[in-house]
A protein has these predicted regions:
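Short beta-strand elements
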Residues: 128-140
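Short acidic/polar inter-strand loop motif in beta-rich domains
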Residues: 120-127
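Short amphipathic, basic-aromatic surface patches that mediate peripheral association
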Residues: 52-62
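N-terminal secretory signal peptides and thylakoid transit peptides that target proteins
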Residues: 1-13
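A glycine-anchored, Pro-Gly-centered beta-turn/N-cap motif
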Residues: 45, 69, 108-110
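Short, compositionally biased P/S/T/A/G/V-rich stretches that sit at domain boundaries
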Residues: 24-44
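Short coil-to-beta strand junction motifs in C2/discoidin
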Residues: 63-71
Length: 140
């Protein structure tokens, strides 16, 4: 392999990880919040969770419009949220990729924490992280 070819291969190898770790920027004044339920709310059965967002827009998953993303509801999640992380899709990380601003949520009886996290077109956490305050609800 010639010196030029080796340099080209090394340069390409250096670029690929950087692209894979790219983080989508968010405005520093973006504000995500849960409109309802309120922190400490006691709820009977399923409920409508309403999402609020300021200084950014809502877009469907896959839509790369700048300063826009879609909601994810974290249920009973305690792991830290880091910019660039891919948001898992499971019962604790509920994706709203159609651009929903409210959703009917069904949880088993008991205490639960809820937190909204805004994801980019590829379900990655923005930089800086755009997340609501974590709230606690009790379902009976």
């Amino acid at each position: 392999m010639s010196l030029m070819t080796r340099r080209a291969v090394l340069a390409a190898a250096a670029i690929i990880p950087a692209a894979a770790l790219a983080q989508t920027p968010a405005p520093s004044d973006a504000y995500l919040y849960i409109i309802w339920p309120n922190d400490g709310q006691v709820i009977k059965g399923a409920f409508w969770c309403r999402f609020g967002l300021r200084n950014m827009g809502i877009a469907r998953a896959g839509d790369k419009t700048p300063n826009a993303g879609h909601h994810h509801l974290f249920v009973n999640v305690n792991e830290p949220i880091k910019p660039g992380d891919v948001i898992p899709a499971d019962k604790n990380h509920i994706h709203y990729g159609a651009g929903q601003s409210e959703a009917r949520v069904e949880l088993p009886p008991g205490r639960h924490t809820l937190q909204l996290v805004l994801g980019d077109a590829d379900h990655k956490v923005f930089n800086p992280v755009v997340a609501s305050k974590k709230i606690t609800v009790t379902v009976y």
